[in-house]
Design a protein with these regions (language model features):
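Bacterial N-terminal signal peptides
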Residues: 5-15
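Carbohydrate-interacting regions of secretory-pathway proteins
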Residues: 19-219
Length: 219
């Protein structure tokens, strides 16, 4: 029995690694940026089809009632050192969402779209904060003097995340909201996937567009 369990575990790990390897990145533009969302469909992404869809050139996450806890739209390609940008908006200023980076995918019961790791948080009172989903909780609060000026309540906001070595920086609309040098040798993440969060219990809509990434040298 243990032998078959080991074989099954190996097969699942192999399938997961193959899925990551099969996610092909587009060619970078002249400035080194690669587009992760083509504006037409969810190619390269994986998530609950009851929650995620593409409308009018943006990704929409919406459901009346979400069962099984938070769910995520996952880009199954690990990244280490990079600058990541995405435009986002919470329709009607309702709900809670975030952008996962250097994260890991896991499962919780029937919910296979569970992600743990660094999250560039956003929602009422949450914009700009660094939260570790499924881990240490809040790692860095938004600079208090920046909180009133960083977001547009009813418009698109540009989130910019820079991760290089042990240091991460988050910006909203050009304003730095947090800077962290994560020196926790056991828990700090150096590499991982990118994902978009839809927070339980639902009953709101979050939108994302213009998602792009630029890879950085380690040093």
């Amino acid at each position: 029995m243990k032998f078959f369990a080991t074989i099954l575990s190996f097969a699942l790990i192999t399938a997961s690694l193959s899925a990551q390897e099969d996610t092909k990145l587009p060619k970078p533009d002249a400035d080194g940026w690669m587009t992760l969302f083509n504006g037409k469909d969810l190619a390269g992404w994986d998530g609950d089809p009851k929650v995620w869809r593409v409308k009018d050139g943006y990704i929409s996450g919406a459901i009346e009632k979400l069962e099984g806890g938070n769910t995520f739209l996952v880009f199954k390609k690990p990244f280490s050192n990079f600058v990541l940008e995405a435009e986002c908006v919470l329709v009607g200023r309702k709900g809670n969402s975030g952008i996962q980076y250097r994260s890991k995918q896991s499962e919780r019961g029937a919910n296979k779209w569970v992600v743990k790791g660094y999250q560039a948080d956003f929602g009422n009172g949450l914009w700009g904060k660094l939260y570790e989903e499924g881990g240490r909780g809040v790692l860095a609060f938004t600079y208090k003097d920046k909180a009133p000026e960083i977001k547009k309540d009813d418009g698109w906001n540009t989130y910019r995340i820079t991760a290089k070595g042990s240091k991460v920086t988050q910006e909203i609309n050009g304003t730095v909201t947090i800077e962290l040098d994560d020196q926790d040798e056991k828990k700090a993440a150096k590499e991982g996937i990118i994902a978009l969060q839809y927070h339980s219990p639902g009953d709101f809509e979050v939108r994302f567009k213009n998602i792009r990434i630029k890879l950085l040298e380690a040093k």
